[in-house]
Amino acid sequence: DTSEITDMSQLFYYSEFNDIYSTNEIGLHNGDISNWNMSNVTDMTCMFSGAKNFNGDIGNWDISKVTDMTRLFNGATIFNQDISNWDVSNVTNISYMFSFTNSFNGDISNWNTSNVASMDCLFYFGIAFNSNINKWDLSNVKSMVAMFSYTKLFNQPLNNWDTSNVTDMKSMFWSAKKFNQDLS
């Protein structure tokens, strides 16, 4: 029963998700977590960070109280599940959330990002990501450092973004080879 848990940070940090379970190897896990009650969780920092084999169905989780998703899927190289219906309206930090992901290209266009303040390195080395996020509300974002750096495929319009409160965009598109959009 996970209904009372508020902090899931680093829960599966560098865990091996596969179809082998051994009591001698604590890091191995392949249980179904799709029905976990996440309704009281506020911190998902690094929850699946480095879990390179994780690709579980977690799209129905109620994460409406979560405020921090820093490095949530950082290095979860095969993760590519539908999380389009996640309520991220209370999240303030999504830095490194999809960094070093090789497969993620989910539709997250309708996420309510109005409370997010930091998007640093959000898609840093995000190999497959090329979804349209032009409708995101960035009115509270302060920092977007290296947000799309080293993305391989990203080339979507961002002309609807209000970046008037952003104070740091250092290296935002550094080595984003495909990006070629009008930012005027």
Where in this protein do the model-derived segments appear?
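Negatively charged
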Residues: 1-184
